[in-house]
Amino acid sequence: MLGEIQDKVYKGTTTVGLVCKDGVVLATEKRATMGNFIASRRAKKIYRIADRVAMTTAGAVGDAQFLARLISVEIKLYEIRKEEKPTVKAIATLLSNILNSVRWFPYFVQLLVGGVDKRGPSIYSIDLLGGAIEEIDIVATGSGSPTAYGVLEDRYTPEITVDDGVELAVRAIYSAMRRDSASGDGIDVVKITKDGYFELSKEEVDKILSSLRRA
């Protein structure tokens, strides 16, 4: 039953996250598929859910969009009630609880929640049943993740900066796009530091891709 439902929904594909010494980097490609059909070439898979926190999604687009709206509202309510910003861990825990509460008919998503708070930079991966794990270095999700992991494992170091992390994230997604038919159609990248939330422009991403193609 679950397999039949999964075959009928739009599915996201490849996302990556890096914990850097001065922040976090999150990146995704833009293709959404329905079976062998390319349903969209402009699927949004990175959502800004708090001041310095973002969420990436792999899986069913409808479920991902609903969860992004829900968690954004919950964060605003938290800030009003507590008069402080929630930590990345608190946001990941809330998402974990939401997903676990509907485990008998789950949202078909795999999430990354990353950002910078008073504890520093951190990223959590969350599965469709609500299992949440803090990733201390690199993480990739979706159908292109095996290829992305190969690139990340080879080039990541604990001392990497967000600027170098951006280039590595683009390289990992680009490699996945070349080998995974469900990944493609451009790359979105976000870097988050104590100074703020920065989304790379298409021109900035294209410049990195051009240098990779020449290498």
Swiss-Prot record:
Catalytic activity annotation: Cleavage of peptide bonds with very broad specificity
Subcellular location: Cytoplasm
Coiled-coil ranges per UniProt: none
Activity regulation, short description: The formation of the proteasomal ATPase PAN-20S proteasome complex, via the docking of the C-termini of PAN into the intersubunit pockets in the alpha-rings, triggers opening of the gate for substrate entry. Interconversion between the open-gate and close-gate conformations leads to a dynamic regulation of the 20S proteasome proteolysis activity.
Propeptide regions on this chain: 1-12
Keywords linked to the UniProt accession: Autocatalytic cleavage, Cytoplasm, Hydrolase, Protease, Proteasome, Threonine protease, Zymogen
GO cellular component: cytoplasm; proteasome core complex, beta-subunit complex
MF GO annotations: threonine-type endopeptidase activity
GO BP field: proteasomal protein catabolic process
NCBIfam families: arc_protsome_B
Function field: Component of the proteasome core, a large protease complex with broad specificity involved in protein degradation.
Family: Belongs to the peptidase T1B family.
Subunit description: The 20S proteasome core is composed of 14 alpha and 14 beta subunits that assemble into four stacked heptameric rings, resulting in a barrel-shaped structure. The two inner rings, each composed of seven catalytic beta subunits, are sandwiched by two outer rings, each composed of seven alpha subunits. The catalytic chamber with the active sites is on the inside of the barrel. Has a gated structure, the ends of the cylinder being occluded by the N-termini of the alpha-subunits. Is capped at one or both ends by the proteasome regulatory ATPase, PAN.
HAMAP family cross-referenced by the UniProt entry: Proteasome_B_A (MF_02113_A)
Protein name as it appears in the record: Proteasome subunit beta
